[in-house]
């Protein structure tokens, strides 16, 4: 453990088009091999496509999708004696946002549309409507926490 405490959070540089920290985080999550301009093109294309399909504000659609994907509970492994228990714990806000972005981008990559822009756009729209693989992942996570509720007294 460091003696000076945890490292301070660095401020996010907001994206130039929407000025939203959430869009900036999404761009950074899509980023591969340091190609930021490519990641920006993918994300902005997906958001513009979402605007065209839904007819609303794309950042609002992204926020709605994030609310539908963010987990509130997860399970953590805890070793007690010789047994390992899956202990349900609450998820901190920063981690829930990070998990939601990771799931959105990860399940976008697994989709079958032709370009990453289309995949991300459709996953965002599906998630904002309560559908899609990322929302299913959140439901599975909550179900796992619910089924292991008996071990909640082991949480730390």
From Swiss-Prot:
Q: Which Gene3D superfamilies match?
A: Ribosomal protein S7 domain (1.10.455.10)
Write down the InterPro entries for this protein, in alphabetical order.
Answer: Ribosomal_uS7, Ribosomal_uS7_bac/org-type, Ribosomal_uS7_CS, Ribosomal_uS7_dom, Ribosomal_uS7_dom_sf
Query: Which range is the signal sequence, renumbered to this chain?
Result: none
Spell out the disulfide connections.
Answer: none
Kindly state the subunit structure of this protein: Part of the 30S ribosomal subunit. Contacts proteins S9 and S11.
UniProt function note? One of the primary rRNA binding proteins, it binds directly to 16S rRNA where it nucleates assembly of the head domain of the 30S subunit. Is located at the subunit interface close to the decoding center, probably blocks exit of the E-site tRNA.
| Protein name (record) | Small ribosomal subunit protein uS7
Q: Which gene produces this protein? A: rpsG
């Amino acid at each position: 453990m460091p003696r000076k405490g945890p490292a301070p959070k660095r401020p996010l540089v907001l994206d130039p088009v929407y000025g939203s920290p959430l869009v900036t985080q999404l761009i950074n999550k899509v980023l591969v091999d340091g190609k930021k301009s490519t990641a920006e093109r993918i994300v902005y294309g997906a958001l513009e496509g979402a605007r065209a399909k839904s007819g609303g504000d794309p950042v609002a659609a992204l926020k709605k999708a994030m609310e539908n994907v963010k987990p509130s509970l997860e399970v953590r492994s805890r070793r007690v004696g010789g047994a390992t228990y899956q202990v349900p714990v609450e998820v901190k806000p920063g981690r829930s946002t990070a998990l939601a972005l990771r799931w959105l981008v990860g399940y976008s990559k697994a989709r079958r549309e032709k370009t990453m822009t289309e995949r991300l756009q459709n996953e965002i729209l599906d998630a904002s409507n309560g559908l899609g693989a990322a929302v299913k992942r959140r439901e599975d996570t909550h179900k796992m926490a619910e089924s292991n509720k008996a071990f909640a007294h082991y949480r730390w």
